[in-house]
């Protein structure tokens, strides 16, 4: 399975993307619009868009942290990718970015979006309120960077940004 979303959602909707593609094709709905009211990682929407099953996708998420991430991907992708490239992946950074989630109203969308992304990639099961992979002392079987391949994640974000004119975001 090709991973399209930069976000981790184990047990998410990605596994139904092929089924939704089949539904669209069998019901002659190709080249239409797909609406995702709770986008999360957005794997189904991205699959439909990248494989040209739909012309446009409308994505929404009530959670301002998730919205901020997608806003950053679509409107500040270069700055987001620079943050990903330049930010060290360690527990000290994790604590700083975790604090941002407690003060969402006092931070701009780019920094909130990056915090959301960083925690999603470094927390157990991608859950924003969970603890760090490997534990605070990093003695677990997996370390904080186990799910954080910077080059691959930047490529995913850049690919999505290339479709920004066909992705409509709301909160």
Predicted regions and their residues:
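SAM-dependent nucleic-acid methyltransferase catalytic core
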Residues: 1-24, 29, 73-171
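Conserved S-adenosyl-L-methionine
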Residues: 30-92
């Amino acid at each position: 399975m090709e991973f399209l979303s930069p976000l981790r959602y184990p047990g998410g909707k990605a596994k139904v993307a092929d089924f939704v593609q089949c539904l669209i094709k069998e019901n002659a709905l190709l080249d239409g619009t797909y609406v995702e009211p709770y986008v999360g990682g957005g794997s189904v929407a991205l699959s439909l868009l990248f494989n040209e099953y739909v012309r446009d996708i409308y994505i929404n998420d009530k959670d301002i942290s998730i919205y901020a991430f997608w806003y950053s991907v679509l409107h500040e992708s270069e700055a987001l990718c620079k943050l990903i490239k330049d930010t060290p992946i360690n527990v000290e950074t994790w604590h700083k970015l975790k604090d941002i989630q407690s003060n969402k109203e006092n931070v701009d969308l780019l920094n909130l979006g990056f915090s959301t992304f960083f925690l999603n990639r470094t927390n157990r099961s991608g859950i924003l309120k969970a603890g760090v992979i490997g534990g605070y002392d990093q003695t677990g079987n997996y370390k904080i960077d186990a799910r954080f391949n910077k080059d691959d994640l930047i490529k995913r974000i850049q690919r999505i940004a290339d479709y920004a004119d066909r992705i409509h975001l709301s909160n």
